[in-house]
């Protein structure tokens, strides 16, 4: 269990969070410890001091906390993010037909307890979009873990392309950009992949 700075939320927000709603709005925060920086992971507690969850904190966003864990014993290291990647991948392997898996949404934000993160798979290419500052800060750990998980399951990954050219990122205090996170292999087929991704 990590020692995290605390955020105390209203009774209404507590009930919503316990019901599965992962967003805490700024107006629902009763108290936040000093020294919390945008993008930090915080411990969310009720007014009575009960653990509600852990989430990404961003005072620049109307959604000030995005809860992504309800296990008080979680430690948010590389192993944690790889486990999250494995949960997302394995769930889809269980519920999808094999032929559909070559073109699918691997990660769908809050539905996979990965706030603001979308990952689409097109064959051996991953297209990634990050819309929350906290997830941006842990992007490398997650994506490196995801690539490992896919390869462990004999699912090839030639490149990862980031499509972070959306205005909503600015509301989180992030810049817009797009480009390769993990470049494709330098062969004719990979070069065609590079062109297709960038143009589409």
PLM feature spans:
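A generic alpha-helix structural signal
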Residues: 82-85, 89, 139, 143, ...
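Structural motif
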Residues: 41-42, 125-126, 158-160
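Short, conserved charged micro-motifs
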Residues: 77, 136-140
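A short interface-forming secondary-structure element
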Residues: 123-137
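Non-catalytic accessory regions of SAM-dependent methyltransferases
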Residues: 1-123, 152, 192
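Non-catalytic substrate-recognition/targeting regions of SAM-dependent transferases
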Residues: 109-114, 118-120, 140-200
């Amino acid at each position: 269990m990590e020692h995290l700075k605390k955020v105390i939320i209203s009774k209404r927000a507590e009930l919503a969070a316990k019901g599965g709603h992962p967003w805490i709005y700024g107006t629902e925060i009763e108290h936040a410890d000093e020294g919390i920086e945008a993008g930090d992971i915080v411990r969310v507690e009720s007014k009575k001091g009960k653990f509600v969850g852990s989430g990404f904190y961003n005072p620049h966003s109307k959604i000030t906390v995005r809860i992504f864990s309800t296990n008080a014993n979680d430690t948010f290291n590389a192993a944690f993010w790889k486990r999250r990647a494995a949960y997302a991948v394995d769930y889809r392997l269980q519920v999808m037909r094999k032929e559909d898996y070559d073109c699918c949404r691997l990660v769908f934000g809050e539905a996979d307890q990965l706030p603001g993160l979308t990952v689409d798979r097109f064959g051996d290419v991953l297209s990634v979009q990050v819309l929350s500052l906290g997830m941006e800060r842990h992007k490398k750990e997650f994506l490196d873990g995801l690539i490992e998980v896919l390869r462990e399951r004999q699912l090839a990954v030639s490149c990862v392309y980031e499509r972070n050219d959306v205005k909503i990122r600015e509301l989180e205090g992030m810049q817009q950009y797009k480009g390769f996170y993990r470049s494709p292999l330098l062969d004719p087929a990979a070069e065609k992949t590079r062109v297709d991704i960038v143009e589409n």
